């Protein structure tokens, strides 16, 4: 299969990016080194090419009412200029994908617009399914990225840098807020959301291919560290942010995944999967996603068995060495009875049981 390439591919390669296959794309896994990139984001600012992700625009009459049929979160909690994190469900209450929904307000007297950012691995299937559901309701579903660039600028210096580039104060742009910015030397207005996947403050910017290439070079010239998928993974895992296909999938309910806060059963809306989630809420999950810290230096990886008293009771979904905490961390599913802070478990790593303890998530939170 021929891998797709983003408009920043050549710039990433020229900048020393080591390219690897990911979700049908050839993407940089690292540049200067995972630890260095991770620390750049935690301490200053880093940038990521995330142009492999899907970006859809829904436009038409009452788009929130229409999309509400597909998600369990109350979309009417957000207004124009705001966004929320939520999930798409199947009829069994399993998670099809997670996404961010941006409310773009009214297009005219009769139509509104939403922007959805979806995962690369699910983008084709999501787009087809959403289009099948939305078009009968009179909405158009279009590929907003359309060969363009999605760039994530993350870290404590990211917003001050954007303020400098735009000449605007962003002090009134809250987390999960969004607006259009005019950036110095960039030809077109830039859709900018104060969102991210690192546990740090930051923004995600949607640009044309030419504008994205120019902004990448501007940021490089200002000393911003380019970062790859490796650092993106360690950063999101320290922040205990889910990765679809690893920490949750179509067989996982939001209650099991620790995302029950996204489910608003008080809404009088018969969204996809509602009946299954009502039953799941009543019975309670038999397993839960927990955070683990491991003793020693061995790293737990996806699908490693979790043990209790020598018996396999669960499975690791994601694991890494935490550059910030300087110890191994992991996410894992375990029986609800063992999903308690302080529970002593172990993870089988290369045939040996490594002691582990259930700890509070996230592993890292900016103070």
UniProtKB/Swiss-Prot annotation:
Enzyme Commission identifier(s): 2.1.2.10
GO molecular function: aminomethyltransferase activity; transaminase activity
Entry keyword set: Aminotransferase, Transferase
Catalytic activity reported: N(6)-[(R)-S(8)-aminomethyldihydrolipoyl]-L-lysyl-[protein] + (6S)-5,6,7,8-tetrahydrofolate = N(6)-[(R)-dihydrolipoyl]-L-lysyl-[protein] + (6R)-5,10-methylene-5,6,7,8-tetrahydrofolate + NH4(+)
One GO cellular component, as annotated: cytosol
UniProt cross-references to InterPro entries, sorted A to Z: GCS_T, GCS_T_bac, GCST_C, GCV_T_N, GcvT/YgfZ/DmdA, GcvT/YgfZ_C, TrmE/GcvT_dom1
Keyword presence, Heme: no
A GO biological-process term: glycine decarboxylation via glycine cleavage system
Subunit structure: The glycine cleavage system is composed of four proteins: P, T, L and H.
Function: The glycine cleavage system catalyzes the degradation of glycine.
Protein name according to UniProt: Aminomethyltransferase
Gene responsible for this protein: gcvT
């Amino acid at each position: 299969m021929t891998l797709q390439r983003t408009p920043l591919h050549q710039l990433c390669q020229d900048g020393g990016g080591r390219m690897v296959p990911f979700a049908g794309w050839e993407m940089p896994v690292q540049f200067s080194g995972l630890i260095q990139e991770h620390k750049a984001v935690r301490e200053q600012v880093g940038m990521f090419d995330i142009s492999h992700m899907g970006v859809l625009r829904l436009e038409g009459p009452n788009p929130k009412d229409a999309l509400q049929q597909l998600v369990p979160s109350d979309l009417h909690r957000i207004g124009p200029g705001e966004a929320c994190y939520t999930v798409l469900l199947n009829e069994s209450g399993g998670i099809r994908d997670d996404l961010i929904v941006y409310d773009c307000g009214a297009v005219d007297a009769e139509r509104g617009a939403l922007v959805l950012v979806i995962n690369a691995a699910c983008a084709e299937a999501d787009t087809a399914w959403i289009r099948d559901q939305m078009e009968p309701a009179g909405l158009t579903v279009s590929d907003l990225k359309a060969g363009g660039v999605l760039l994530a600028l993350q870290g404590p210096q990211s917003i001050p840098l954007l303020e400098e580039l735009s000449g605007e104060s962003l002090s009134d742009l809250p987390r999960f807020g969004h607006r259009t910015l005019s950036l110095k030397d960039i030809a077109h207005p830039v859709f900018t959301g104060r969102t991210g996947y690192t546990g740090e403050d930051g923004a995600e910017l949607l640009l044309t291919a030419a504008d994205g290439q120019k902004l990448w070079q501007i940021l490089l010239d200002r000393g911003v560290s380019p970062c790859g998928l490796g650092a993106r993974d360690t950063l999101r895992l320290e922040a205990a942010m889910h990765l679809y296909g690893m920490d949750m999938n179509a067989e996982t309910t939001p209650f099991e995944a620790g995302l029950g806060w996204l489910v608003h059963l008080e809404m009088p809306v018969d969204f996809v999967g509602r009946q299954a989630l009502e039953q799941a809420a009543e019975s309670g999950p038999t397993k839960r996603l927990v955070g683990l810290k491991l003793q020693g230096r061995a790293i737990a990886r996806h699908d490693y068995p979790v043990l209790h008293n020598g018996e396999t009771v669960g499975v690791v979904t994601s694991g890494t060495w935490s550059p910030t905490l300087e110890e191994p961390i992991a996410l894992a599913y375990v029986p609800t009875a063992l999903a308690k802070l302080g529970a002593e478990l172990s993870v089988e790593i290369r045939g040996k049981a490594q002691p582990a303890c259930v700890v509070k998530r996230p592993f890292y939170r900016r103070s």
